Regions:
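SAM-dependent transferase fold signal centered on methyltransferase-like domains
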Residues: 1-271
Length: 271
């Protein structure tokens, strides 16, 4: 317990951990000194009560409880405790930066809209290609185009929401240098998708879980030499291999329709 706090608190001179369950506070008080967090204070109280008496701080991190009084899991922000939407103005009055950890099940577009311009950054975090967390960074001043960061292990893609200009898009990968290729051609039309030219398109690409959650498919087309198969698809094709594509890649060897006879011939010999 308090893992997020233990990592973030290391970059601050003072840190305060607030938890309303006494047993979790006891665990934190035991663990923090062992982890070298002698500057961390543990308070067993309701976070809203502590917020009322809190002075000015550099940053506030909240991980709202996602279970109701009956122990059932909740997803909507208003159903979590505390309700960050209600406390937004007070939080930002106390700290210029507020980070909120939310369920990856949330519609992040609606969530950003609900905060009415207070969201400056959206971090969609995945590991092993499984979306784990949605992190919002709130700030003072109205933001109309928050930075969206899609992270899946070493793969990180960032862009400005509402602005598809490649000047606001960066790709980074710990193993590969950032690509400088920019492709602005339109997605494959419905007609060309139905009459797929396998002699030209040799590779199939599926974005990772964070990008799928973000839905930033136009950004992929702008940043990489890939073409969206269809507006209703999440798959892309390319004529050349792209080593640093943020997702899975496949070499296209054969193409068939869903005709049973054709599929049987194509898959003959496969086990």
């Amino acid at each position: 317990f308090g893992v997020d706090f233990s990592y973030m608190s290391r970059v601050f001179n003072r840190a305060t951990y607030v938890e309303q369950q006494s047993i979790l506070c006891d665990i934190a008080r035991h663990n923090f000194p062992i982890l070298g967090l002698d500057h961390a204070e543990v308070i067993n109280d309701d976070s809203t009560a502590v917020l009322d008496t809190l002075g000015r701080v550099s940053m506030i991190f909240l991980d709202p409880a996602r279970r109701d009084d009956h122990g059932s899991r909740t997803y909507a922000i208003a159903d979590c405790m505390p309700d960050v939407l209600t406390l937004k103005d007070m939080l930002l009055a106390k700290a210029p930066t507020v980070m909120v950890k939310l369920s990856p099940m949330l519609d992040w577009h609606k969530t950003v809209a609900d905060f009415a311009g207070a969201v400056h950054e959206v971090h969609i975090v995945s590991t092993g290609n499984e979306c784990k967390e949605l992190l919002l960074v709130l700030g003072r001043g109205r933001c109309v185009s928050p930075l969206v960061v899609c992270a899946n292990d070493e793969q990180v893609l960032s862009y400005k929401a509402g602005d598809n200009s490649d000047n606001h898009t960066t790709i980074s990968d710990s193993a590969l240098a950032a690509r400088n290729t920019c492709n602005t051609e339109d997605s494959l039309s419905e007609e060309s998708a139905n009459d797929f030219d396998s002699s030209h398109w040799k590779y199939l690409y599926e974005p990772n879980a964070s990008i799928m959650k973000a839905g930033c498919f136009d950004v992929l087309e702008q940043r990489f030499a890939v073409h969206h198969i269809s507006p209703n698809s999440h798959l892309f094709v390319a004529a050349e291999p792209i080593a640093d594509f943020p997702g899975r890649s496949f070499a296209i060897e054969s193409i068939a329709t869903m005709n049973k006879k054709e599929l049987k011939q194509l898959l003959a010999g496969l086990t």
